[in-house]
A protein has these predicted regions:
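PAS-family sensory/regulatory modules and their coupling/dimerization elements
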Residues: 1-46, 50
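Short flexible loop/turn segments at helix-to-beta-strand junctions
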Residues: 122-131, 135, 165
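Short conserved segments within the C-terminal catalytic ATPase subdomain
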Residues: 147-157
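Conserved glycine-rich
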Residues: 255-256
Length: 284
């Protein structure tokens, strides 16, 4: 820093970033003259912490997207090349075709999730309507019942009607992503409990499971884009790594509070507390 000040005294304009007490500043130091005489130096410091964090997140997101897009594409290309070159036995053909179809579906899902997140980031205004969380929970449970039965996991819905004023598709995304994870990371013979309630001006959606749980030190990161608690299981479990990030952003879009409680080896409970609809379109 002192060297840069001396350089400014010598007539050189100095611009650099400086980190101090957990904040980041853009500093500009320049020589000030009065006539032909040196009057001093001018030092300007701008707090650019938020911009720096945004840029860091953008770079990380771009790197992660590139990796997540490349992985299924490589698998698709590999299978296609083997088939094209006649290196696949007729009896093995269904396996390779299934691989191409599976990885293609994964790629499409990733792109759709990225588009959803982009729309939420941009704050695009989406038409809202009355949505009953109990109906959403019931529909979600029915859609996931096949996956749950395949893993020997029971899915139950209980509670009472709780209406919110919001975007039905986004609220469905919240419920579906939470419940899908609860099934996906559960244990054989486990259970998923979806609860809906209305109290104290809040419409509550609670998803509780008896799954593998999340270590305490990782709980604050599970809603980050592409973050996976257990990377060794990510390929087997599928998914894009964006589901919980969509939950976080969709909840924020509805001014809903998101809380997570988890004990490794015992399970996880996620609660989304929406403003309860009172008949007014301002109830958000």
């Amino acid at each position: 820093f002192n060297r840069r000040i001396m350089n400014a005294f010598a007539g050189s304009n100095e611009t650099f970033n400086l980190q101090k007490h957990g904040r980041e500043y853009k500093v500009d130091i320049s020589r000030v003259e009065s006539g032909e005489n040196l009057a001093g130096i001018l030092l300007l410091a701008f707090d650019v912490t938020e911009q720096a964090e945004t840029e860091k997140m953008r770079r990380e997101f771009t790197a992660n997207v590139s990796h997540e897009l490349k992985t299924p594409l490589q698998s698709i290309m590999g299978s296609a090349e083997l088939i094209e070159n006649g290196l696949v036995k007729p009896e093995d053909m269904p396996h390779f075709i299934k691989n191409i179809r599976t990885e293609s579906a994964r790629l499409v899902a990733l792109i759709e999730d990225i588009i959803r997140l982009s729309r939420l980031d941009e704050g695009v205004e989406i038409p809202k309507t009355e949505v009953d969380l109990l109906n959403v929970a019931t529909e979600t449970a029915e859609l996931l019942r096949g996956n749950a039965e395949a893993k020997n996991v029971s899915v139950k819905v209980h509670g009472k009607s709780a209406v919110v004023f919001g975007v039905d598709r986004l609220i469905y995304e919240i419920a579906y992503n939470l419940c899908e994870n609860a099934v996906k990371y559960n244990i054989p013979g486990g259970a998923v409990d979806i609860g809906v309630d209305a109290r104290k001006g809040k419409a509550l959606l609670t998803v509780r499971d008896t799954g593998i749980g999340i270590p305490k030190e990782q709980q604050s990161r599970v809603f980050e884009r592409f973050y996976r608690v257990d990377k060794s299981r990510s390929k087997d479990s599928g998914g894009t790594g964006l589901g919980l990030s969509i939950v976080k952003h969709a909840a924020a879009y509805h001014n809903a509070e998101l809380t997570l409680e988890s004990v490794p080896g015992k399970g996880t409970c996620v609660t989304v507390a929406f403003p309860l609809y009172d008949g007014s379109e301002n109830a958000e």
